[in-house]
Structure formats: C-alpha cells, structure tokens
C-alpha cells in the first residue's frame, strides 16, 4: 500500500523518530499507526530524538582494560539524573562502549568533531581517484559522498558498527538505550591508551650482546 506524507508526519510527531524510520515502520506494518509506534519502540527508535534535546550532566566515567593491561580506555557518558547513572542498564551501556572503543579504535565521537582540513584532504584524494575512472562529474560526486560516509564510519564512534552486534551502529545502540531508560544519554568524550604507543623501542645488537655475554 502507499504510505502518505501525512501518515509519516503524524507518526514522527507521536514518536520523535526520523522520517525514514517512520516511513519504514508504516510500510512494515501496513500503514497501521499503533503498530508502527510499537515497531519503532521495539527498534529503540521511538522518542529517542525527543529526549536527545534535554541536558545530560550526570553520568559515569567508565573504563576498560584489555590484553593483560596493555590497552586501556576511559569514556565519559552523561545522563540526566544520578538515579539513572546508578541503573544497571546504563552502567552496562557504558562498559559496552568502553569495550567497543578498545576494539574499534575510533578517533572521534561524532562526525562534527572531525577536523575540516582532514576531511578536505580525504575528499581531494577520493576526487582524484574517482576522476581517473573517467566517470561523469555527477557520478564522481556520488562516489566521493560514499567514500566520505565510509571514512566517517571508520573513525567516528557513533557511526561504527557496534562490536557486539555488527548489524547496528553505536548510534543505534545509543538510541535503543535512551528509549529503554527514558532519559537522554550522551557519549561526551573518550581516551584510549596503548602501552608503548609512540615510543621508539631500542634496537639491540644481537652480536654485541653475545660478545658481551662471552666476555669478549
């Protein structure tokens, strides 16, 4: 059946979900408004965007240590109330995000944080490669757009596939947690530490070591 713009807008007002999510929900449920609301709630999409505008100043600084103490992560995740900060689901979310950062090594939380100069350099590389193919300019721009989105998905935490469920992104997991807990949650910042990173290891002279051991 055909889904009208009015149906999509009505569902969006009721749930706060995105337009494309609302359209998909209505399509999947045959245009039934109530079933579409339930569909979005099950997906963790209903009301998350409405809550996202509220200020979150409480929360936790979570940590994760991996590989015998050779990799460590600190992440700050904010919520609206101290009550939620003590919630087991919230604490599990913080732990999951710290673990994800350790495994996926993002550089930024969100795409808005990417240095514009870095982005422009990437675009220039993509544009040069795409033009070598001899494709029309409009196709080249679409190729560049796709490459930029892949670039964001590689380096931005919220756009990365979630390590415990690659069928969804970290953003989707965040939306699901917001919907389940009923409060705005925000991943503010993180830091990853790898033992010895940036240090130059002293290269040993094996022959000299043998000679020294032999007293030569």
UniProtKB/Swiss-Prot annotation:
Name one matching Pfam family: EF_TS
Q: Where in the cell is it found?
A: Cytoplasm
- Superkingdom of source: Bacteria
An annotated GO cellular component = cytoplasm
Broad class of where this protein is predominantly found: cytoplasm
Q: Identify the stretch(es) annotated as Involved in Mg(2+) ion dislocation from EF-Tu.
A: 81-84
Report the family membership. Belongs to the EF-Ts family.
According to its UniProt entry, the function of this protein is described as: Associates with the EF-Tu.GDP complex and induces the exchange of GDP to GTP. It remains bound to the aminoacyl-tRNA.EF-Tu.GTP complex up to the GTP hydrolysis stage on the ribosome.
Q: Which HAMAP family match?
A: EF_Ts (MF_00050)
This chain belongs to the protein called Elongation factor Ts
Q: Name the species this protein comes from.
A: Geotalea uraniireducens (strain Rf4) (Geobacter uraniireducens)
């Amino acid at each position: 059946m055909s889904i009208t713009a009015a149906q999509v807008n009505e569902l969006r007002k009721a749930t706060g979900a995105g337009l494309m999510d609302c359209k998909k929900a209505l399509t999947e449920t045959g245009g039934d408004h109530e079933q579409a609301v339930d569909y979005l709630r099950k997906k963790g999409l209903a009301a998350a965007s409405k809550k996202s505008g509220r200020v979150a100043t409480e929360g936790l600084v979570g940590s994760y240590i991996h590989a015998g103490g050779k990799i460590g992560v600190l992440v700050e995740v904010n919520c609206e109330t101290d009550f939620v900060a003590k919630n087991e689901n919230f604490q599990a979310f913080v732990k999951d995000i710290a673990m994800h950062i350790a495994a996926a090594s993002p550089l930024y939380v969100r795409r808005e944080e990417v240095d514009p100069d870095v982005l422009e350099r990437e675009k220039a590389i993509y544009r040069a490669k795409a033009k070598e193919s001899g494709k029309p300019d409009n196709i080249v721009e679409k190729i560049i757009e796709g490459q930029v989105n892949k670039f964001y998905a590689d380096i931005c935490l919220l756009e990365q596939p979630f390590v415990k469920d690659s069928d969804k992104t970290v953003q989707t997991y965040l939306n699901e947690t917001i919907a389940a807990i009923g409060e705005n949650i925000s991943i503010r910042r993180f830091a990853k530490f790898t033992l010895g990173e940036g240090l130059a290891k002293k290269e040993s002279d094996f022959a000299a070591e043998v000679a020294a051991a032999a007293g030569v």
